[in-house]
Amino acid sequence: MIISHFQAQELLGAKKNKINEIMISLDLNLTKSKIKIQNNFFIFPDGQHLDEKQLEKIIKNDTTCFLIIDNSLLKIQLFSEQTKKFYKLVPTRDAPTIEISGIRMHVTKNFTPWEDTKRKIGSISPIRGIVLDTCMGLGYTAILSSTYADFVITCEKDENVIEVAKFNPWSKGLFENKKINMLKTDIFEEIKLFKDEMFNEIIHDPPRLSLASQLYSLEFYKQLYRVLKKDGKLYHYTGSPGSKFRKIDLAKNVDERLRKVGFKNVKKVHYGLACKK
């Protein structure tokens, strides 16, 4: 069972209004479960319980998701000695996002992560055939693409990200959906092993430029072009409209490089660019 400040506020509100039972989500907004309020305890379906102090702790940690284990709270976060990075699952009003050393991997200001992903995929609809999701993260792109595609290959090189995804109810499809093949690998190297014209669509949603400059390189774009089928479509995330990195217009530079390797009909779409081969 997972709980965040959203559910904690609901529970404390119910107690304040002297309500004895309330339906809340224990899987980060996918489903609802009945919670009983008795003798200052909040009793969960499996018999575990929390008190007001524990719920107040959750509310104070409003960028953290908590596992309920043995009537105690465990933050869904970790620090990697190998990467020297801090990873945590951050709640929203629907699907959570992942934060890596303070940087959130989804656009959360104007959209929830799930809606953000839908819009990215919608930029190159209809999705069909075999799809490449270059940078998995929590897997929302792969999961939503699998609804329409015949098969999805998704790549993630950071095992810590995969570990966080294992705790996320919204990422369940990564590990159970037979239409999704998750590769624990660096897409910069892995793409060289893919056959020519292997994919009908590609969704390239890389980390920001400062964290993965090679995924914005001409060399990598040549590989994207090579593995995409004729008339296949590419979505490339570039960031907020008008945003610049060190005074560099990233979208403009990406546009130029995509055209240089052969992509056509390059156009601005939701937080990125869409184009065809």
Residue ranges and their predicted role:
Residues 155-196:
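S-adenosyl-L-methionine
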